[in-house]
A protein has these predicted regions:
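Ribonuclease/tRNase effector modules and their secretory precursors
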Residues: 1-168
Length: 168
């Protein structure tokens, strides 16, 4: 597995606002404007509704809901581990087929998602399969986060189940 991009630590910045602006600029460069592809299919991001003049999708990469039942975007809390790893999102998408990565599909409600797991780094990126009105396929970047132990076990079972069902 190749080496992940360098983490962007908060410690080198004078304020949270400076840090947030820097990681947003990196998000725009490495994700939004990078023409990312996953399995030769474009990866797009959600912009609306914006929060604090930044794209909706950005917040789902760098923050988490304090309460899973609260869908108010303004109440999301920054997660420094997610923030530090903003460069890892594009890196995971473009390297998903390499050794050290696992990927598979799962169902979440009516949506088909793709989970990309940088296994030895315990970091996942979630994409949703979508189509345009003209039936053109694309992936929507949903979120990315560091795994906790209980989630690793759950994802391992899900991965094994997906690949077992593909063989049968």
């Amino acid at each position: 597995m190749n080496t992940p991009p360098e983490l962007i630590a908060f410690t080198g910045f004078d304020s949270w606002n400076d840090y947030e602006n820097e990681i947003y600029a990196i998000y725009l460069e490495t994700v939004v404007n990078a023409n990312l592809l996953f399995l030769n299919t474009p990866v797009k991001v959600r912009f609306r509704p914006t929060t604090k003049d930044k794209a909706f999708g950005f917040w789902h990469l760098i923050s988490e809901a304090a309460d899973q039942n609260n869908k108010d975007e303004d109440d999301r809390l920054p997660d420094l581990k997610r923030c530090e790893r903003i460069r890892w999102v594009a890196w995971c998408i473009t390297n998903a087929h390499q050794v050290g990565f696992l990927y598979w599909e799962n169902q979440r409600g009516r949506e088909t998602h793709v989970v990309i797991w940088a296994e030895h780094l315990d970091f996942v990126v979630i994409l949703a399969k979508r189509k345009t009105d003209l039936d053109e396929k694309y992936y929507l970047l949903k979120t990315a986060y560091c795994l906790r132990e209980h989630t690793k076990r759950k994802l391992r079972k899900e991965y094994e189940s997906f690949h077992t069902s593909k063989k049968g």
